[in-house]
UniProtKB/Swiss-Prot annotation:
It is a peripheral membrane protein. The keyword Transmembrane helix does not apply. This is ATPase synthesis protein 25, mitochondrial. Disulfide bonds: none annotated. Residues 1-14 form a transit peptide. The lineage of its organism: Eukaryota, Fungi, Dikarya, Ascomycota, Saccharomycotina. The gene is ATP25.
Amino acid sequence: MNKFCLLPFHGKRIGVANIPFTILLKKGPYFLHSHITAVYYSTKGKNDSHEQSRVSKKSTFTPLETPWYLRIVDNEKELMEGKKNNHHTMNKELEIPKTSPNSLRKIADLLTGKLGLDDFLVFDLRKKSPNSVSAVNKLGDFMVICTARSTKHCHKSFLELNKFLKHEFCSSAYVEGNFNERQESRRKRRLARKSNLSKLLGRSSECSAKDLNSEAWYMIDCRVDGIFVNILTQRRRNELNLEELYAPENEKSKFQNIDSGNVPTISGVNEISSNNNILLGLRRLAQQRRRYSTINPNGLSNLRYFLQKEDFKGANKIIQSSSGTETHNIRTLEHVKNTLKDLVGQEKKVDVVQWKSLFDEHSTFLTINQSAAYWPLRLEYAILLNKADPQFYSDRVFLKDYLLLKKSLGQELIREDLIALLEMVLKTQHSSHSYFNLVKQNRVIIRALNLFKGLQTEDNGSVVYDEEVISLLLNSMVADERVKLRSLYETIDHIFQTFGDKLTSGMIVSILQNLAKIKDWNKLLQVWEAITPTEGEGQDKRPWNEFINVINQSGDSHVISKIVNNGHLLWIRRLNVNVTPELCNSIKALLKTAGMENSTLEEFLVRGKNNQ
């Protein structure tokens, strides 16, 4: 038998496959799959026979199975059939509120059927409880929440829904949360800059390119029957828990996160990426280290000492060193307000910027929730800041810093808030009384009035139609004799049409004073005669004393003589007006200015009344 051998090589191990039919020539035909032998040679000595190993592997022939790339099609078919069955069951179990419009059913069928959105929920916001009225109830009538599989699925669903609304209802949807390419590139640059800064500071950053577009929330106003659609990814939906926000008061407990393992801690919230997540950022601020204030009498005296010196660093140390409940924090803010009130009352110059930042720094979220005590305190503090420096803390700052803040936090605005703004507008001083400066002032008032729409007073009347509010509004329309808003006369006519015979004395006096300020005497007499009673004696309750004082203070001899000579004062006797001592003095002063002192007319109006 002839054999072919391989000489050993000095170096690394060399594995040689020794196939029997190529080595043993006398053997018969040999099948390749029956026997395979591998021989490994070593570079060590000949005696090291244990270093040589032979590995034999026997394999048996098995029938071929379906390759994995052919099984993919079958698996996808089974998956699609399962999804169709799930959608059929979901459509059967789809709950739509009773007495809902047909448009809601069509939109629901599109979202769950064609677009394949899951976990479909509808909240009926039409049933508004008077004890739980919030901004959510005023958004719309129906709030829809559904889950998408990815951000691309969210975007595609919005596009299809918008096409459907245009085709079926001729309406174009408004969306929040849809980022265009420019916004997305800007967002990526910010995240990259944040990541680089974290690396320089030795911190780990979770802002990776993979997580940039992993979550999304599309809030869509369909503009059809008050329907809003929220399309979220699963993780974002779990984070926001919008169900608890939109659910009625008696059903909120069903959607609360009871599992303590899912409730984020302070460290857990800090670890979650808060990119473009406002609600998560607010939660993080609420759970961070809070500053409480429980100050003993010695601490209060020290705090007052530092505040009077305007040593805000020392005051901050005293407040932060104490701990307690949020009620004590309210007391601390009240002490700060009282100190500022004393300084402003003494007409001392104060640093308004530092005083405002001190109050804001210690206004935590839990403190703000105590609305019964916090918001009146903040209103009084804002009025003091405006009184100390009207140029810095102007009416525009008050609109954003107080009114918009209070409204955005779900608190109800009241009559005193609007009055405070109007008084600030009237106190604002401009370098010149021009028409354009007056228009700028009233733009602030218009923005504020939009916030008070639908709000009522204790008498179930609109806040805008309050007597003091109307007087301040009319005063804000007139700067001097030459500068006034063109809408002044329209406002006066609207007040007459709205109230009619129910005009109060305060409203009449305000109208007369503003017309006298611009010296429109014809309109003034027209208004005065328009409210003359016609039902008989004893019915004239017009403010005669204020009317005569307005005429007398004008100093216009032509107007005064016209009032006296045309017999306007005779209506005092004709309508049996109650002549008070104040009215007697006003009549005497007016007749003295007209040169008719101790005249027959004076005796008829004043002395004749006293003789009766």
